[in-house]
């Protein structure tokens, strides 16, 4: 990301998969990340200690409007970023769910912290690959491959729409 930033890129649309924590969340819906719980190491090299790091309101609003307009199922939500996936213990899972996380992944907090530090805009759209349970790991979600292809198409469409927008500085922020 930083290398791309040095070449003048300042808006980052990120997609990826995540383990589902909140089983009430429809697994076929996408997660538009509003904020990430910082439980990894990289973000602390870029920002002062804090529980959360927010993603870009500007890009989130752009993605939100695109997803609504095109009929995709999604929810703005919080993710938990950790770089120690073998330490997703029952106690830590409970704590992160209490703190609002609907899913767990390994990069959002780090990327969002770098973006904030460097003055970039970053948003992340996630799909569920599996369910992280307190006592075991589930198999991969049956829609995983379909959702991965769908999120890749969404990202390509978003970038094209963003680049062809007359003035992306005038993106209207939406309340999520």
Enumerate the language-model features and the residues they cover.
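Generic non-transmembrane alpha-helical segments
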Residues: 62-70, 114, 154-165
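Metabolite-binding pocket within alpha/beta catalytic cores that recognizes anionic/polar moieties
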Residues: 1-53, 57-61, 117
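Short acidic/polar active-site loop segments enriched in Thr and Asp
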Residues: 10-11, 102, 121
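Generic structural signal for well-ordered, non-membrane alpha-helical segments
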Residues: 52, 56-60, 72, 89, ...
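Active-site rim beta-loop-alpha module in soluble metabolic enzymes
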Residues: 50-98
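His/Asp/Glu-rich mid-to-C-terminal helical/loop segments that flank catalytic regions of hydrolases
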Residues: 132-176
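Zn-dependent metallopeptidase/amidohydrolase metal-coordination segment
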Residues: 109-143
